[in-house]
């Protein structure tokens, strides 16, 4: 009796009681699949062999994709590849280059066309009439008025997710690929134009339609909506090799001569001083919309001989781009670029032209 009582009293001690409960819990744990919350049992993990198999499959797929790439890339597009289609004039030949011609922006040996320093010439064997027929087939029947209004209402607003911003580079080569990428999931693309290219919106519309194969269904100041066509198939889109970097611009002849054509040195100097002290016709902003600049300059030349454009904060590079475009479109003669000011001279007029203006 005394021994039994001693064992009970010993069992009532806290240390022995804790060990007794732990042993009892270990005996009561079942081997069933039931896994209550906060249990020490961990979920079964996948065997490592399966993970290795998945990795090998992914590596095989990536190797197949690499092997499928054909280098050099062969493109059937009938036009010459340039960095910018709307902001360069192929008729004006450069007088020098800032980098060797062998450095093609498409990468070494990645294109079947020869790089001349400014363009990648298309093959003369490409049939342009076939490209025109294919474009007409993709566009299909003309859209009805209801379809056009519905399409415009979806893509003309500023919150449209399918938008491409067109900057001072104009219609660039890689932009054509961006347009086709948007056309995979959308019928049209909203294009917002800013900067120097907005001086000639007709030129932008022409190159967008010609190079992409689409059709512009909406045009409002500097906003365009480019439609892909009824029969457009993303799987049969044209092959457009990308430019890996922006090529250095070549060296062109000087835009402003020391002595303007038809004038003497003293006369050009006097006109430059008059232009700097004359009131500015317009004040242009950086990356602005210059749609009405050409018309305003033409109207001013009907009464004035010299026009000054205030291009403060625009940048000298953009000032020269503006001068080049105005020289061709107005037409006029740029005689000075100084302190972000553009001085334009209308040129010498004949007697018949003066009578018409009067």
From Swiss-Prot:
Residue ranges that the Swiss-Prot or TrEMBL entry lists as coiled coil: none
Feature: transit peptide: 1-28
Gene Ontology cellular component annotations, sorted alphabetically: mitochondrion; ribonucleoprotein complex
Main location: mitochondrion
Pfam family membership, one: CRS1_YhbY
Record has Repeat as a keyword: yes
Family annotation (InterPro entries): CAF1P_plant, RNA-binding_CRM, YhbY-like_sf
Compartments (UniProt record): Mitochondrion
GO MF annotation, one: RNA binding
Keyword Coiled coil tagged: no
Region (Disordered): 35-64
Subunit structure: Part of large ribonucleo-protein complexes that include group IIB introns.
Function: May be involved in the splicing of group IIB introns in mitochondria.
UniProt protein name: CRS2-associated factor 2, mitochondrial
């Amino acid at each position: 009796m005394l021994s039994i009582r001693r064992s009970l009293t010993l069992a009532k001690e806290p240390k022995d009681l804790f060990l007794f409960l732990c042993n009892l819990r270990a005996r009561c744990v079942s081997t069933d699949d039931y896994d209550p919350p906060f249990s020490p049992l961990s979920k079964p993990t996948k065997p490592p062999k399966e993970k290795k198999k998945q990795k090998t499959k992914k590596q095989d797929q990536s190797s197949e994709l690499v092997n499928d790439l054909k280098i050099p890339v062969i493109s059937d597009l009938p036009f010459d590849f340039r960095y910018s289609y709307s902001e360069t004039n192929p008729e004006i030949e450069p007088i020098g280059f800032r980098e060797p011609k062998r450095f093609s922006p498409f990468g070494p040996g990645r294109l079947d066309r020869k790089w001349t320093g400014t363009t990648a010439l298309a093959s003369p064997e490409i049939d342009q009439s076939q490209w025109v027929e294919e474009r007409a087939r993709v566009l299909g029947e003309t859209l009805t008025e209801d379809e056009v209004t519905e399409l415009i209402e979806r893509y003309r607003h500023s919150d449209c997710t399918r938008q491409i911003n067109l900057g001072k580079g104009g219609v660039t080569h890689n932009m054509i690929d961006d347009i086709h990428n948007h056309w995979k999931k959308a019928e049209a693309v909203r294009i917002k134009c800013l900067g120097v290219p907005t001086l000639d919106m007709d030129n932008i519309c022409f190159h967008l339609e010609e190079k992409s194969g689409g059709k512009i269904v909406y045009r409002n100041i500097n906003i365009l909506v480019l439609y892909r066509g009824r029969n457009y198939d993303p799987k049969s889109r044209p092959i457009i090799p990308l430019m890996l970097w922006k090529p250095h611009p070549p060296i062109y002849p000087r835009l402003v001569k020391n002595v303007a054509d038809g004038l003497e040195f003293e006369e050009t100097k006097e006109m430059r001083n008059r232009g700097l002290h004359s009131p500015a016709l317009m004040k242009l902003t950086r990356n602005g919309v210059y749609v009405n600049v050409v018309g305003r300059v033409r109207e001013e030349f009907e009464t004035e001989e010299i026009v000054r454009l205030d291009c403060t904060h625009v940048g000298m590079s953009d000032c020269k781009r503006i001068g080049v475009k105005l020289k061709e479109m107005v037409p006029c003669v740029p005689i000075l670029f100084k302190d972000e000011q553009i001085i334009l001279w209308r040129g010498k007029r004949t007697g018949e032209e003066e009578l018409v203006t009067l």
